[in-house]
Amino acid sequence: MALMKSVRGFTPEIGENCFLADNAVIIGDVKTGRDCSIWFSTVLRGDVNSIRIGNGVNIQDGSVLHTLYEKSTIEIGDHVSVGHNVTIHGACIKAVSYTHLR
């Protein structure tokens, strides 16, 4: 099971039927929808602001999602795929999108 850690009184909330890789790290104010997959070596850092992830989202291996203190949250819409080793630092990604490295 993934490492899930409470920070500043916030505990991650994972939706129904989600896959969490054994070495994924999910910290703080993170909420996912249902049917998501969080793959190996992925880090979701909701330690200084919130991360909201829609339904059917796929966050692939090695990706890091990190918010900006008192500036920006992360919002990911439904059916988004975040490619391998992508860093998202305070952003809003609309539904049915794909992000990747070139």
Q: In which residue ranges do the predicted regions lie?
A:
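Domain-scale signature associated with acetyltransferase and cell-envelope carbohydrate enzymes
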Residues: M1-A95
